[in-house]
Amino acid sequence: MTGNDPFTNALAGMDNAESVGHLSYTVEPASNIIGSVLEVLYDRGYVDGFEYVDDGKAGKFEVELKGAINECGAVKPRYSAGADEFEKWEKRYLPARDYGTLIVTTSHGVMSHYEAREEGIGGQVIAYVY
């Protein structure tokens, strides 16, 4: 898959692979932000696992899918959200309250909006998954 934004391509590719029933997907090229988002997806139970593979170029991630993703995507442009403003973005990107996850980049790293709300910190909404 070619495009200008590897992050968006990674999420769209995983979404497409899940929708046709594939059990794995290769994300190329690898980046720190993609790795951090995959860690959040793993922690929230959306993927079975992932592994970084050094191919001598930019690297890649082998992602084990488990069929738990109905839809995922990048949020463009990146919206800033305070710790008390996540509900507005939940209404916009998620189908129901407490169903799905917004992925947020904060000064404490990449995390789900549930963790950010719990810690009382805001950040930029970069992706959603449900």
Curated annotation (Swiss-Prot):
Q: Which GO terms describe its biological process?
A: translation
Q: Which key words are in the record?
A: Ribonucleoprotein, Ribosomal protein, RNA-binding, rRNA-binding
Q: Does the keyword Amino-acid biosynthesis apply?
A: no
Q: Which InterPro entries match?
A: Ribosomal_uS8, Ribosomal_uS8_CS, Ribosomal_uS8_sf
Q: Tell me which PROSITE patterns the record gives.
A: RIBOSOMAL_S8 (PS00053)
Per the record, its GO cellular-component terms are: ribonucleoprotein complex; ribosome
Looking up Pfam families in the UniProt record yields: Ribosomal_S8
- Report the domain of life of the source organism: Archaea
Q: A single Gene Ontology molecular function, please? A: structural constituent of ribosome
Q: Report whether RNA-binding shows up as a keyword of the record.
A: yes
Q: Which family does it belong to?
A: Belongs to the universal ribosomal protein uS8 family.
The record describes the protein's role as: One of the primary rRNA binding proteins, it binds directly to 16S rRNA central domain where it helps coordinate assembly of the platform of the 30S subunit.
Quaternary context: Part of the 30S ribosomal subunit.
Under PANTHER family, the record lists: 40S RIBOSOMAL PROTEIN S15A
Annotated NCBIfam families: PRK04034.1 (NF003115)
HAMAP family per record: Ribosomal_uS8_A
Can you name this protein?
Answer: Small ribosomal subunit protein uS8
Identify the species of origin: Halorubrum lacusprofundi (strain ATCC 49239 / DSM 5036 / JCM 8891 / ACAM 34)
